[in-house]
C-alpha cells in the first residue's frame, strides 16, 4: 500500500470475487486477501466475538464457531466461498438478516489503513479521523433524514452510523464502503447463539404481490427469515429437477422460519401458529421436521442458480438484481416493476428477502447487438427512478459497484 500510494497507483481490495456488480475489479493494484490474509485470529465465546483477517471464508468461520454454539448471523448464499472482507466491503447479509442484521450490525471494530497510509482501529470513536466530528455536526439534519431510512438502504455510504445517537460508530459507517475509504486488514465481529429447533412455515397466496403485501403483518411475530417467490420460479425448478415438495395452495408463497430466542418463552411451534394467525394467506403448511424443511428450502436454493436462465432458455443477467424498498411498499413496487419489465419486453423471475423488502431478479435483457446497450441503460434509469419514488435503495444487498454507481442521483 505504501508503494502504491507513493506511485499514485489505485488499489482495489478483493475477497473471493463473488460480487456481481463489478465491486472487486479496478485499474492499478488488486489485492487478493483470500491468498495470505485468511486466518481466524481469535474466538472469544464469553464476549461472543471473533477477530479475523479479511480473507477468511464465511463458512470456515461458521465451522470454527459452531463448537461454542455460536455463529456469525449474516449468511449470504455464497457463504461457502465469500470472504469476511468482501462481506464488510459490501455490507453483505442473507435470508437471516431479518433477525441478525447485516454485516454492519455485527461489526465491533476494524483495523484499517486509510489513503494517507495511517493505520488505526475504527470503532465507536470519531477522533481517529480529523474533521469527522465537524462533518457530522455540520450535516446533522441531512444524515438523520436521508440515510438509514430502512434496513436495506445499502446504496451510498452509511454515514448515519456517525450520528451521536447511533454511537458515533466509525466501524459501522465504513462497512459497505466497498473499499473506497480504507483497506481493512483485521476485523472484530459479533457472534450470536445458533438458532435452536427452527420451524418452517410456508404461506400460500393468490399472487406474489399479495404475498409481498402481507409482509408487514408478519414482521411483528419476528420470524428468523421471510423469503418470497411465485410459481414461475417453482416451475423452473420443477422442470430442472423433476419434482418439488408439496406447497400450499396459491401462486405466490412466503417461506418463513421461526425459532426460539433467549428470554422468550414462546416455542417455535407457538411462533408458527402466531405467524399463520397474523397472515392473510389462503393456505399454509407448518413443517417441524428438519429434513422436510430442508427439501422445501431447496426450492429457493435451486431457484437462485436456475434463475440465470429464463423459462424460454434465454441468458438472464444481473445488473438490476437486488433493489429494495421499505417492506410496506413492497407490493405496489412489485406491481410497477413487473409493468416496467413488460414495457421493455424483458422477462425475469423475481424472488427475494421479502421481510427486508429486497427483490432479486435476473433478466433476459438482449446484450448481443450494439443497439441493445442504450436500451438496457434506459431500463436501468427507469428502474432506479421507480425505486427512488418508493423510498427504496438501488441495491439492498450486493452494493453499487461499477454496475449501479452512476444511478445514485436517483436516490440522493
Question: Where does each model-flagged region fall?
Answer:
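N-terminal glycine-rich flavin-associated loop
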Residues: 1-11, 29, 33-76, 88, ...
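Solvent-exposed alpha-helices and their adjacent loops that cap or buttress functional pockets
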Residues: 13, 22-25, 32, 40-45, ...
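Beta-rich nucleic-acid/ligand-interaction surfaces
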Residues: 80-85, 233, 237
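Cyclic nucleotide signaling catalytic output domains
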Residues: 411-412
